[in-house]
Amino acid sequence: MSETGRGPCTVPVWYRYTPGDGVRITVGPGSRKVRLLRAAGRASLCVQVETLPYKYVSVEGHIEVVETAVADDQREMARRYLGEKLGARYLTANAATLAEEILVVLHPERWWSVDFSQVRW
């Protein structure tokens, strides 16, 4: 996602992936990120494991913007990235902001991956 004269918008995001349900992220309603996503109608995401053995997966596809974020998604992402206790505290402390967030679903069309534990040198 990019604007004229600028590089692509690349920022870390929390995500939730369930096969058949797409890659789900939540974004602020007035953010540059959601504005660019709406304009492009497509997105890509790359995630990696930096510890050995190095692995990554990249996915590209069309997006669906859902006007209200799903609390289950926010809860699962908070637990995944912050753990049970800190995730619960984050959700409570940010309840008003989270209630305004928008859900974006990336529907995978192309995948690329590397798993160096599977590479035979």
PLM region spans:
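Charged, gly/pro-rich active-site loop segments
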Residues: 55-121
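Generic marker of residues within folded, mature protein domains
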Residues: 5, 51-53, 96
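Short beta-strand segments
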Residues: 1-29, 37, 43-47, 56-58
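Short, solvent-exposed aromatic-acidic interface loops
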Residues: 28-32, 81
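Generic internal hydrophobic packing segments that stabilize the cores of diverse globular domains
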Residues: 34, 40, 71-75
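Short secondary-structure boundary/capping segments
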Residues: 15, 35, 94-96
